[in-house]
């Protein structure tokens, strides 16, 4: 996924991605199954997707990183609670498990950003593939 592809996504035009979205492996992996509608603060245009909040989340990753360069589940939940205080621990645990798609037991800032980008790409692809049926009124019954 190139930066040109990302620029076409309206929800992501306000989103700046620190350190770039360069992970080709993540871009080619399958679209995740999470629905952002499950978490109120994870809606497009919500507080999670402002540059200020992304910067805060990145700072939390950098501050709370252990010697492996990643956050375990408890540290992830604690860090995310500082920024997304209205989200339940259960929802953050679910988010952690979905971001940690390779089941290593930890997430990095890059994995988090890659996950969010794939999620928005999947939502945008789904939105583009949907179409509306147009019914013309008055409707007529066509005998078979």
UniProtKB/Swiss-Prot annotation:
The keyword Coiled coil does not apply. InterPro entries: EF-hand-dom_pair, EF_hand_dom, WD-EF-hand_domain. PROSITE patterns: EF_HAND_2 (PS50222). Keywords: Repeat. Residues 52-86, 87-122 form the EF-hand domain. One of its GO terms (molecular function) is calcium ion binding. PANTHER family: EF-HAND CALCIUM BINDING DOMAIN 8, WD40 REPEAT DOMAIN 95. This is EF-hand calcium-binding domain-containing protein 8. The gene is EFCAB8.
